[in-house]
Amino acid sequence: MEVNYERLRGSYNDYRKLELGLGEFGDDFVGLPDDPFCMNIRSTLNSISDWFHENQIGLVSEDHTLPEDPFCMRVRSTLNTISDWFHENQKEIGVVDQMLFETLSWFYNNDDDDGDDDDDGGGGGEAHDAFELVLPYLELKEILAVEVVCRSLRDSVGKEPFFWTSIDLNDSFLQYRVTDESLLKLTRRALGGVRCLNLGGCVGITDYGLKQVLASNPHLTKLSVSGCLRLSTAGLVSTLRDLKSSNRLGVKSLITGGALYFTKEQFKELNLLLGGDAKVGLQERKKRFYTSCRSEFYLEDDRVTDLEICPWCEKPSLVFDCPADTCPLKGQYPYSKSSCRACVVCIERCHECGSCLNDCENKPFCFAFSCVVCIEKRSNRL
């Protein structure tokens, strides 16, 4: 079925009827206020963003600390609940995941030179020779599971630095379990040869732990700290600065995922430390869409970080483009060529296609941000 886009770009009343599926009976609902509880969500998002930017200055000193929960969001309580859930449901996660829990507990309770000790992990049988051909193609989760099968596989995996040069902890339940100590023990297996480290969602990693890992792996060139909630912008910049001064900094590309808030001065220093340019020309930048950037672990072009200066608010942030060929925002502002390029605070985007949700004050009162085109497609599938 072909979608009539002209009809979808109709009035706000038609949009409310289409979303609610009320047809002619939707007139009674269209008259409802857009913000019945006076929450003023748009201004709240801007206030939160401004607060973070204003309070990032001068936080390098230990005397300056942020409040535990400035907006009463109870983030730490939520994280503790998630962690407790994993502890309580270990038996229901599966055999492979249980092996990973055992392997991770080995990181906590043993040193790297304890390989000769007796253990109950599979006995002393010899593994098939074919495993030597398979191991280089396994991912981290599979390698950790193979390691607890038998003693010979543990020796093969633990004593081969090649298997640990690229460590990806993103999209794994391990990200809620890894601490500074266990991460350091894990990276030591590469004998200082870690090249790529993805810590996406590792909520237990602190500034101190990250500094230890970076200092012990001077050849690490690619780092992702997306979702590392215990890291601070000031601590990260300070770590990179110290390693740079001692000529031990190997990081060339950094992915933040928008989890850290940088001031303009911090963003400029970050680019200098990583050897990049804070003012990358638009012609040198490929388009980035909101839907394809949520869990990516790569950097296109030659940029050193996923952050840019937003053309609207002129603050360092994740900047996205609009995938729509025709957008109502184009031509309405002095910088028409880049009017669809902005951070998610300045321009809210559809969570399904990434297009602009302009004129947010006239949107229905809901938290499921979707454009009318995606709503129409979703209704046709019902």
From Swiss-Prot:
Q: Which PROSITE patterns match?
A: 4FE4S_FER_1
Domain (F-box): residue spans on this chain: 16-105
**Gene3D superfamilies attached here?**
Ribonuclease Inhibitor
The family database entries (InterPro entries) matched by this protein are listed as: F-box-like_dom_sf, F-box_LRR-repeat, LRR_dom_sf
The set of disulfide-linked cysteines is none
Q: Which PANTHER family match?
A: F-BOX DOMAIN-CONTAINING PROTEIN (PTHR13382:SF84), MITOCHONDRIAL ATP SYNTHASE COUPLING FACTOR B (PTHR13382)
The protein depicted here goes by the name F-box protein At3g27290
